[in-house]
UniProtKB/Swiss-Prot annotation:
The gene is KATNAL1. Residues 128-139 have a biased composition (Low complexity). The modification N-acetylmethionine is found at M1. GO terms for molecular function: ATP binding; ATP hydrolysis activity; microtubule binding; microtubule severing ATPase activity. ATP binds at G248, P249, P250, G251, T252, G253, K254, T255. It catalyses: n ATP + n H2O + a microtubule = n ADP + n phosphate + (n+1) alpha/beta tubulin heterodimers. Residues 116-127, 143-169 have a biased composition (Basic and acidic residues). It comes from the Eukaryota. This is Katanin p60 ATPase-containing subunit A-like 1. It is an enzyme of class 5 (isomerase). Interacts with KATNB1 and KATNBL1. Residues 96-182 are annotated as: Disordered. GO terms for biological process: microtubule severing; spermatogenesis. Its main location: cytoplasm.
Length: 490
């Protein structure tokens, strides 16, 4: 009997039950229960046989629970069909015969027994008609409708207060609260999704948290940070750049650079991916793009970071391009071109900077490449950068006195920033792995924190380097350098 097959069938039965595929789950449960039954017949040891029977009993209980769920769902299917035809048959007879006669009758308005919005409007028309006839009949209807008119006045005052509050929020004059974007004309769910999933204010990433990349930091300061500090200087031909494209292999710190820009500027940071700006409904993706840029202008100064922009704005006109994808690209290009134009006459400090990152710059559309006026290369870390990155990654870990980070930095040449972080993480776990080797779960739980806080040694790094290889090849680096020679704009 294959024990691995028994475990696999039990696991699949539980997974299918969690996913709601109860029929498949019941099949796996039946199979594993029969397998355990056959396995128990071949066991001679009573203690082991008792444990297997206990496991079989637990699986039987789970199987019964799944069966009860299936029977409950089946009962819903049986009970629902007769309910709907009854209601559908009742409504056609009730609506034309009962409701139409009282609706045109205007005698129900004066008693004011109920006060829905439907009855308030006829009352206003009656009062206007009475006033037109003469002042004689004015006292009687007014005395009967004092309370509704008072409630309307209160509603109007409350509405006025809400409008004033909204204006104050937009002007930033309320009591230190963050202004709220008014998504009039857009679906409320779309606005809430962008607010919830994209907007992150004051990300806590600073320049010092990023090792090396001094040239990239310098250019980003000039393109984004300095126009915020010197708005009077960056005007006319010196206007801020519309967009910056960061090109480089994966794991070199492009996303962290964008977050550092948002932190140093004190701007609102929009982190956008292809899943954020796509929808299965026709025309909704373009609305999301337009809504994103309108929200960015509202929360200005703003940094819009579009990660993996090649997945959104690949080349147009290819044979496999879909119409919906083309419309999204067109809307994005229009909005990006409109960022500078919309802000030329506004306060220069209220700018919207578009940062983009990609690992495949050769797939980007030509029109988008023109709008991203600065195109900078984010390379692999240098020897100095690798040593700095090791210090940043290991600042919370105790190191052995014999470790020299410069020697380790020489051994990890060709590693990206993400690769180096993985090496540091794996090396910092080596001491813990040695300490818990051979211990039972109870003994592991009983270990104190001091026993696990052991220094990282040189041998730990050597073991980690044997397990983790670099993720970027020399051929990839050559492609990036060739593209930068042709299209770079640093």
């Amino acid at each position: 009997m294959n024990l691995a097959e028994i475990c696999d069938n039990a696991k699949k039965g539980r997974e299918y039950a969690l996913l709601g595929n109860y029929d498949s789950s019941m099949v796996y449960y039946q199979g594993v229960i029969q397998q355990i039954q056959r396995h128990c017949q071949s066991i001679r040891d009573p203690a082991v046989k008792g444990k297997w029977q206990q496991v079989r009993q637990e699986l039987l209980e789970e199987y019964e629970q799944v069966k009860s769920i299936v029977s409950t769902l089946e009962s819903f299917k049986i009970e629902k069909p007769p309910d709907f035809p009854v209601s559908c048959q009742d409504e056609p007879f009730r609506d034309p015969a009962v409701w139409p006669p009282p609706v045109p009758a205007e005698h129900r308005a004066p008693p004011q027994i109920r006060r829905p919005n439907r009855e308030v409007r006829p009352l206003r028309k009656e009062m206007a008609g009475v006033g037109a006839r003469g002042p004689v009949g004015r006292a009687h209807p007014i005395s009967k409708s004092e309370k509704p008119s008072a409630s309307r006045d209160k509603d109007c005052r409350a509405r006025g207060r809400d409008d004033k509050g909204r204006k104050n929020m937009q002007d930033g004059a309320s009591d230190g609260e963050i202004p709220k974007f008014d998504g009039a004309g857009y679906d409320k769910d779309l606005v809430e999704a962008l607010e919830r999933d994209i907007v992150s204010r004051n990300p806590s990433i600073h320049w010092d948290d990023i090792a090396d990349l001094e040239e990239a930091k310098k250019l980003l300061r000039e393109a984004v940070v300095l126009p915020m500090w010197m708005p009077d200087f960056f005007k006319g031909i010196r206007r801020p750049w519309k967009g910056v494209l960061m090109v480089g292999p994966p794991g070199t710190g492009k996303t962290m650079l964008a977050k550092a820009v948002a932190t140093e500027c004190g701007t609102t940071f929009f982190n956008v991916s292809s899943s954020t700006l796509t929808s299965k409904y026709r025309g909704e993706s373009e609305k999301l793009v337009r809504l994103l840029f309108e929200m960015a202008r509202f929360y200005a100064p703003t940094t819009i970071f579009i990660d993996e922009i090649d997945s959104i704005c690949s080349r147009r006109g290819t044979s496999d391009e879909h119409e919906a994808s083309r419309r999204v690209k067109s809307e994005l290009l229009v909005q990006m071109d409109g960022v500078g134009g919309a802000l030329e006459n506004d306060d220069p400090s209220k700018m919207v900077m578009v940062l983009a990152a990609t690992n495949f710059p050769w797939d980007i559309d030509e029109a988008l490449r023109r709008r991203l006026e600065k195109r900078i290369y984010i390379p692999l870390p240098t020897a100095k950068g690798r040593a700095e990155l090791l210090k940043i990654s290991l600042r919370e870990v105790e190191l052995d006195p014999d470790i020299r980070l410069e020697d380790i930095a020489e051994k990890i040449e060709g590693y990206s920033g993400a690769d180096i972080t993985n090496v540091c993480r794996d090396a910092s776990l080596m001491a813990m792995r040695r300490r818990i080797n051979g211990l039972s779960p109870e003994e592991i739980r009983a270990l104190s924190k001091e026993e696990l806080q052991m220094p990282v040694t040189r041998g730990d790094f050597e073991l980690a380097l044997k397990k983790i290889a670099k993720s970027v090849s020399a051929a990839d680096l050559e492609k990036y350098e060739k593209w930068m020679v042709e299209f770079g704009s640093a």
